Regions:
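Internal, well-ordered alpha-helical segments in soluble enzyme and binding-protein domains
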Residues: 79, 127-130, 196
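Extended mid-to-C-terminal alpha-helical interaction segments
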Residues: 155, 163-264
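Short coil/loop linkers at secondary-structure junctions
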Residues: 3-7, 18, 48, 141-144, ...
Length: 264
């Protein structure tokens, strides 16, 4: 069946990961190693939708501190805000954000911005599946988004994606995203617990520095520019807005690296 592949032992060794590390509850894999692990799993199991179905059954509590923080939030809107705000402590070389479209629909966008990670399809599919289940934790197992977007080309077994998300799925898009109506944001989370939320946030902040800090501002500026290039060369103000810093801060960081805006 579709979920049978989930119980197959993942090929840690082939992905460059020591098997005895697999059970460590606070294990933090480099994003490149994580992506290799799931691409290799899909290859060895000959199940091209491995990441899709892995993410589909991955519950928010399986996300560790990050997941517990989200489901402890008072409303779904604050749960998604918690996910995006704490993402920098969970994973580097990537972004997670929620933006409102002109038509009022919301986009929960996820993308890896490290150019050296080329094979990233499995990661994208399992990640959106995880985020879907955070929303379903609040709205119920039958809730579905309006649309789902993936940046990779349409695979052969693409109808599985529409079954997994119960929604139209579009491929070769600018980013990976769940598109949904905003009227669900005020719904209360069933496991809301402000005290637990505070503890989880504090633990994540103390366990390690923000991955954005680890990536370095200069690297984040370059990644933000690359991300916008398909839509034309971005302005300094656009990049500053994306990074939530002032245009002057962007210019100072470039100057510190003896680079101009166009060099970056």
């Amino acid at each position: 069946g579709k979920l049978d592949v989930i119980i197959i032992a993942l090929p840690f060794g082939d992905a460059g990961i020591l098997p005895d590390m697999a059970g460590a509850p606070t294990l933090k894999l480099k994003l490149s190693a994580f992506c290799r692990l799931f691409e290799e799993s899909a290859r060895q199991t000959r199940h091209e939708n491995f990441g899709l179905w892995f993410g589909n059954q991955f519950m928010p509590r399986d996300l560790g501190l990050w997941g517990y923080a989200a489901i402890s939030a008072p409303t779904l809107g604050s749960a998604l805000e918690t996910l995006t705000n704490l993402f920098c402590y969970q994973q580097g070389s990537s972004f997670l954000r929620c933006v409102r479209r002109k038509d009022g629909l919301l986009r929960l966008e996820y993308q890896i911005v490290a150019p050296e990670i080329v094979a990233r399809r499995q990661d994208a599919e399992l990640s959106l599946g995880m985020f879907l289940n955070v929303i379903r934790e609040c709205c119920g197992p039958k809730w579905a988004p309006e649309e789902v977007h993936f940046e990779h080309p349409r695979p052969q077994a693409w109808r599985d994606h529409e079954e997994a998300f119960a929604a139209p799925v579009y491929f070769s898009q600018p980013t990976n995203a769940l598109i949904f109506r905003s009227d669900i944001l005020e719904r209360p989370m069933p496991a809301r617990d402000l005290q637990l939320l505070t503890v989880m946030q504090t633990c994540m902040e103390k366990l390690g520095p923000s991955s954005q800090a680890a990536d370095g501002l200069f690297g984040r500026i370059r990644a933000a520019i690359r991300m916008r290039l398909p839509g034309g060369y971005p302005s300094l103000e656009q990049i500053a807005h994306d990074l939530r810093i002032s245009p002057g801060a962007v210019q100072r960081e470039l100057s510190d690296h003896s680079a101009t805006y166009k060099d970056a």
